[in-house]
């Protein structure tokens, strides 16, 4: 915040594991990166293809194809690639070099304590991610600077490890420990604790047909009561409603409008069918516009990633 106010150098860094299409979680991260980039941050976006290989056994050829789509999504959302650094872990030598250094700063016991009993490749992947997070402070990008890393709360372990490594290697590299923001893990559209690829009805991607997304929203769980009469009398429960949640976190920018929706649901004047219909139109319009932009940016994404 001080760097933004005082117009000093700072960076924002995050990325994506290229295992599938953009969904609301990756959308949240992308929007945060773009926000900080517009505030003057040097922006870095990693394609975590080494992690995808170690964790999901996806080949670099497979993740290359997925990454092109991911980057086209990022560009369509407003990322300025001319003033940012987009890269694949597999191709970024500076990240891999830092991981080699960091290997001397952790023990096997530490990695087991953080990540549990896993194969060595996943521990290596964690060190690669530390290299990603600290890449903005590499001398080639201007050296040490405050860095913010927007991630989901499930990535907290990586940030804690990286801050520890930044302190351990401060004398050698003069790192400033990175800060982080944690975005909300959204409930599944089916009412589950979070959206999951295991259940296609619990989430949607930005590349699904808009009508299919509309159908998922229409079929979604809500915080409504058993009957219309009961809802009008007792009010709905927006706190458990994924429709309210995706609207609040993604598709309605005006806080007053979000508060109005909450209060109308709570007092029973807004019924679930009406709310779903409104949200469905907002989401479908956003997705249609996004897909039009994305289609025009696929070739640019291929060029950025060096894909023929």
PLM regions and their residue ranges:
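Positively charged, phosphate-engaging catalytic surfaces used for nucleic-acid and nucleotide handling
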Residues: 83-203, 241-243
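Compositionally biased, low-complexity linear motifs
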Residues: 35-42, 144-146, 205-207
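Active-site oxyanion-binding pockets that recognize sulfate/phosphate
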Residues: 57, 148, 152, 269
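Conserved nucleotide- and phosphate/pyrophosphate-binding catalytic cores
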Residues: 143, 156-157, 163-308
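N-terminal Rossmann-like or analogous alpha/beta NTP/dinucleotide-binding catalytic cores
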Residues: 1-11, 18-138, 292-295
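Glycine- and acidic
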Residues: 13-18, 146-147, 261-265
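A short glycine/serine-rich beta->alpha loop
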Residues: 16-22, 116-118, 147-151, 231-235
